Regions:
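Bacterial N-terminal signal peptides that target proteins for export
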Residues: 2-13
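Bacterial N-terminal signal peptides
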Residues: 11-23
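Compositionally biased, proline/threonine/alanine/serine-rich low-complexity intrinsically disordered stretches
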Residues: 27-98, 647-654
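Noncatalytic scaffold domains of N-terminal-nucleophile
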Residues: 82-122, 126, 134-135, 139-300, ...
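Active-site rim segments in enzyme catalytic domains, especially the processed small/beta chain
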Residues: 147-154, 158-173, 190, 324-327, ...
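Short beta-strand scaffold segments in enzyme catalytic cores
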Residues: 153, 158-165, 459-463, 526-528, ...
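Internal maturation/activation junctions in enzymes
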Residues: 372-476, 485, 607-608
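Extended C-terminal subregions enriched in glycine
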Residues: 517-520, 552, 561-609
């Protein structure tokens, strides 16, 4: 998919703001509402009334909690999967068995981590081994990912998180999406009235929003953490100080062939002592990042949202080219808040996703459309199954691009998008052959179409602790290495390029237009699946820009409708269908299947976007667990052999 706007001459339209005095950081320490796990009636999401300010955070206590010794057994690693059976001429083959051979490690022990880098997985397992809870391990995983996979996520980015409480069977959501500065202007990505080049916008100071991942994790930890906040950064601080070997993937994105060639700042941060850019296998130490993590450990999120680091972020975003408007007041005012997830039935299970500005509602709509077809009776080698998948995807994107945005600023018609009568109407538009791109449904909202381009600098991970609590978290700096600007050893996001560059389309306002204080719409949609008894079934998610929704939907269809094993579901080919574009992994589809799609009007082309990076954990009905990591990236799924139960929650555990 081409993600470039036409390039036009730069005109300076934003002047640098004077730095404002900091106000006390008050990242949300809100109590979560009674979260839902079943499928309640969904109200339309509308801009709420002004909410009272969240109470201020105090610095974390420094008294360490007593921790049991970690288990001494080495964790087991998930092996790679083999190919699916080839399609047979004339008729699709029988559905593969649920698990014809061991495709992923399976265990009755509940402590698991699946993430995009083995060192991040080990960091999470280390915390679980000390008796930590799932949320504790999530903090450690994110801290390590910011070191070993900095091109995808980190301290300077944002995230969405779902949390499953095994004691209550409930699912909660928390929004750590980046926020536009108060002075952000609707036209800030326009030049002479036209959208500027996408790369030009990405590498500008205007692209950076207030990062939310750390504020979100601290808010979540205050409610559902077990160990002290300070302990959770120890693995990443140790690795940043002592060094780690650069992975092939990190080295690839530092190379000249990267879709976003490294900026001068990125090259300076990720270079050897001789000045050459890091190569695969080089030992990389990041002492500045270690200092940042130590400050976060000692001071909590104040270390990021106030003081020296906050001032450095503001200074970095006010540099040419195209300086932005981020202020210390914007940073100090960041809030993360608990909310109820959106949960809907699919194939006898309940699928839960975050509410807007996540695009989880679009994923639920696509699944609902597919349930109006016979896709569940088909197999993954049947061209008709993939045709139905593609058409449902196109319908989903048409509605998503028009209606989904930050509900604090525009009404999002969640209930209407998921209404059974509306779903039936949308599904009826799927004919025998692919035609022109479908139009969005008429929901009595005068909105323009959103043409936002979404990059793929993102990561997803899943944690299950010894008590069965679960974290499913998608985290991002947006594009590869975010804005290309760095401070204190980490990368700043370019999340504001997830807004539509033009505030109107055809004279109608665009829901996802830029506005000060607004959070851009996101395709990130971490998933937790539960059964009718509110028991945990699966947690999964993926990076991949706007294709995240299709990567997730493919995996859910394969797992819940086609009854494939977890690893088979993750490794199925990816197919992307949005508007006029049909792309996919041609080498993973059989010639017979591709021919069948051509007969139905779909000519797949090789995709230009970054591939999926699915990570998932599944609980079987016999109580055993299975983890899977997408072979398209460097991730692993590993379990921790018998561990002590998580430490009991102490008052003020932050």
């Amino acid at each position: 998919m081409d993600c470039m706007h036409n390039r036009y001459t730069v005109s300076a339209i934003v002047s640098a703001l004077a730095l404002l005095c900091s106000t006390p950081y008050a990242a949300a320490a809100q109590e979560p509402p009674a979260p839902v796990a079943a499928a309640p009636s969904t109200p339309e999401v509308s801009p709420p009334q002004a909410a009272p300010a969240n109470p201020p955070l105090s610095a974390p206590e420094t008294t360490p909690a007593a921790t049991p010794a970690p288990a001494g057994e080495p964790p087991a690693e998930t092996p790679a999967a083999g190919p699916l059976p080839e399609a047979q001429p004339g008729a699709p083959p029988p559905l593969p068995a649920v698990a014809p051979r061991r495709l992923a490690t399976r265990s009755s022990h509940q402590a698991w981590v699946a993430a995009a880098n083995p060192l991040a997985v080990e960091a999470g397992l280390e915390i679980l081994g000390k008796g930590g809870k799932a949320l504790d391990a999530a903090v450690a995983v994110q801290a390590m990912l910011g070191l070993v996979e900095p091109q995808s996520s980190g301290v300077g980015g944002g995230a969405f998180l779902l949390y499953y409480d095994a004691g209550t069977g409930k699912v909660s959501a928390i929004d750590g999406r980046e926020t536009a500065p108060a002075a952000a202007a609707p036209e800030m990505f326009l030049e002479h009235g036209r959208p500027m080049s996408f790369v030009e916008a990405v590498r500008s100071g205007r692209s950076t929003g207030v990062p939310g991942a750390i504020g979100m994790l601290y808010t979540a930890h205050a409610k559902v953490g077990g160990l002290r906040w300070k302990e959770l950064f120890e693995p990443a601080i140790r690795a940043a100080s002592q060094g780690f070997k650069v992975s092939a993937r990190l080295a690839m994105f530092l190379g000249e062939g990267s879709p976003f060639p490294p900026t001068t700042e990125i090259r300076a941060l990720f270079s050897r002592q001789d000045g050459e850019i890091l190569q695969e296998g080089d030992l990389f130490q990041n002492p500045e990042y270690a200092k940042t993590l130590q400050r976060l450990a000692d001071e909590g999120p104040r270390a990021l949202y106030q003081g020296t680091i906050a001032s450095q972020m503001v200074t970095a975003t006010h540099q040419e080219p195209l300086p932005g408007t981020l202020s210390v007041k914007d940073l100090a005012g960041y809030r993360a808040a608990w909310s109820e997830p959106l949960c809907r039935p699919f194939q006898g299970f309940t699928v839960c996703v975050p509410p807007p500005p996540s695009s989880g509602v679009a994923l639920l709509q696509m699944l609902a459309i597919l349930e109006r077809t016979d896709i569940a009776k088909r197999t993954p080698n049947d061209p008709q199954a993939w045709y139905l998948f593609a058409q449902a995807s196109r319908l989903m994107y048409a509605d998503r691009d028009r209606y989904v945005a930050d509900p604090r600023f525009v009404p999002v018609p969640v209930a209407k998008l998921l209404d059974p009568a509306y779903i039936k109407l949308r599904a009826s538009l799927i004919g025998p052959r692919a035609g022109a791109p479908p139009q969005p449904g008429s929901l009595a909202l005068n909105r323009g179409r959103d043409a936002t381009n979404e990059s793929a600098g993102t990561s997803h991970f899943v944690v299950v602790d010894a008590e069965g609590d679960v974290v499913s978290m998608t985290t991002t700096v947006e594009s590869i290495f975010g804005s290309g600007r760095t401070v204190a050893g980490f990368v700043l996001n370019n999340q504001l390029t997830d807004f539509n560059f033009e505030p109107t389309e055809g004279g109608r306002p665009v829901a996802n237009a830029v506005h000060g204080g607004k959070r851009p719409r996101s395709s990130m949609a971490p998933i937790i699946v539960i059964d009718k008894g509110n028991n945990f079934v699966a947690a999964l998610g993926s990076p991949g820009g706007s294709a995240i929704l299709e990567y997730n939907a493919k995996t859910l269809v394969a797992l819940l409708a086609w009854k494939l094993s977890l690893k088979q579901a993750v490794e199925l080919p990816n197919l992307i269908a949005r508007g006029e574009t049909f792309s996919g992994e041609l080498g993973r589809f059989s010639p017979a299947l591709l021919a069948g799609l051509r007969e139905r009007g779909i000519e797949l082309k090789t995709g230009h976007a970054e591939n999926s990076g699915l990570h998932a954990i599944l609980r079987h009905t016999d109580g055993t667990y299975e983890g899977a990591a997408d072979s398209r990236r460097e991730g692993v799924a590993r379990m921790l052999p018998p561990v002590q139960k998580p430490a009991k929650r102490a008052v003020g555990a932050n």
